[in-house]
Regions:
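Conserved beta-strand-loop surface patch within small alpha/beta domains used
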Residues: 1-81, 88-171
């Protein structure tokens, strides 16, 4: 993993975005969100990772403070997961994030934002709920309101899940 990070950092510094997006897509496919976030911080730009219905990964670079949900042509819906970064701050749902999630309610299943404090997730509910939602009414009433999962806790869960998978395979 260290080699992948160093290679990605060299590509970012060299301005070779196409090569960088391929590396980020691979890291995202492996669930290595901490590395994806560090690359975004190093580049000083937000980035967006979108998993489509066929589990194809699409990566899009934004600016220092904005990367809206912007699916490329030919992508398969529904979108399984949209992950984007806030490289200069915390994981929270900005107004742009909320607008993107609201607009994607019918075609997006889950969204996450990566920030310095951890990972914030939301999952679309089949029906609006009165418990823990992003808004009281409208499209955001169909999205769960969750707490930020600190990076340390995320790492522990990831390690725990890896150990469980190894145990299941070896039994």
């Amino acid at each position: 993993m260290k080699d992948e990070v160093n290679t990605a950092l060299e590509l970012i510094e060299g301005g070779k975005a196409d090569d960088t997006t391929a590396i980020i897509a691979e890291l995202a496919s492996r669930g290595q969100w901490e590395v994806v976030y560090l690359l975004s911080v190093t580049a000083g730009r937000e980035l967006s990772v979108l998993f489509d219905a066929e589990n194809t990964v699409h990566v899009d670079w934004g600016g220092p403070g904005l990367v809206p949900l912007h699916p490329p042509l030919g992508i398969s819906i529904p979108f399984r997961l949209w992950v984007h970064t806030h490289p200069h701050g915390y994981a929270y749902w900005s107004q742009t994030d909320r607008q993107s999630i609201a607009q994607g309610t019918m075609i997006l299943e889950q969204a996450q934002v990566l920030g310095g404090n951890g990972i914030l997730s939301t999952t679309r509910l089949e029906h609006p709920s009165s418990l823990g939602r992003l808004a009281d009414s409208g499209p955001l009433a169909r999205w769960t309101k969750e707490q930020v999962l600190p990076w340390e806790e995320w790492q522990l869960r990831k390690q725990s899940n890896s150990c469980e998978a190894i145990t299941e395979v070896s039994v």
